[in-house]
Amino acid sequence: MANILFIDNFDSFTYNLVDQFRSLGHVVTIYRNNLSADAIEQALLQLDNPVVVLSPGPGAPSETGCMPELLQRLKGKVPMIGICLGHQAIVEAYGGVVAGAGEIIHGKVSMMEHQNHAIYRGLPSPLAIARYHSLVATQVPSALTVTAEVNGLVMSVVNEADKVCGFQFHPESIMTTHGATLLANAIDWALSSTPAQTQFA
């Protein structure tokens, strides 16, 4: 069981995700991104088996309150999973570039090819996924490995050593097949060999 510290970027999908994680047996505590990074770090210190989940939300990753600072502080110290906007923030935190996807995608089902990483264990490729985004990772830094794509667009990334992964799509959507399994796999992977550091500097 994970203790999930959930960063809410003021998004309508937040409680769908929270309900999904709770139905998988995890404890979820929600913190909005208008809190300070210091306050969230202090909350993390109280948790066993912590995993930080970065929610979807409106706007650009740089406009998400404490989230960019929090990512810089926590990467390599706590496992993290980013979804949509959270995924884009992960890409930027590791030095990548997020820009316009060329079209606005709102509620579109796409067939995604994945690389059989552990987060996709037991899942078919291609996999039907739900997309709601206008931005996409256009330059992925060497610290991140692309694990899935749709027509050359990056749909997920991981940093294996830091136990950080990002999904551009929405696993919690009813339009994503096997979404619950994907989220369960992601938590299992995040906790499988967590980063060695346990203290926040």
UniProtKB/Swiss-Prot annotation:
Keywords carried by this UniProt record: Amino-acid biosynthesis, Aromatic amino acid biosynthesis, Glutamine amidotransferase, Lyase, Tryptophan biosynthesis
Stored InterPro entries: Anth_synth/Amidotransfase, Class_I_gatase-like, GATASE, TrpG/PapA_dom
Reaction catalysis annotation: chorismate + L-glutamine = anthranilate + pyruvate + L-glutamate + H(+)
Description of how the protein assembles with itself and partners: Heterotetramer consisting of two non-identical subunits: a beta subunit (TrpG) and a large alpha subunit (TrpE).
Organism: Vibrio cholerae serotype O1 (strain ATCC 39315 / El Tor Inaba N16961)
An example Gene Ontology molecular-function term: anthranilate phosphoribosyltransferase activity
SUPFAM superfamilies according to UniProt: Class I glutamine amidotransferase-like
Pathway(s) where this gene product acts: Amino-acid biosynthesis; L-tryptophan biosynthesis; L-tryptophan from chorismate: step 1/5
Protein name, as recorded: Anthranilate synthase component 2
EC assignment: 4.1.3.27
Top-level taxon in the UniProt lineage: Bacteria
GO biological process: L-tryptophan biosynthetic process; phenazine biosynthetic process
Binding site for L-glutamine: 57-59, 88, 134-135
Glutamine amidotransferase type-1 domain segment(s): 3-196
Pfam families referenced in this protein's UniProt entry, alphabetically: GATase
Protein's gene: trpG
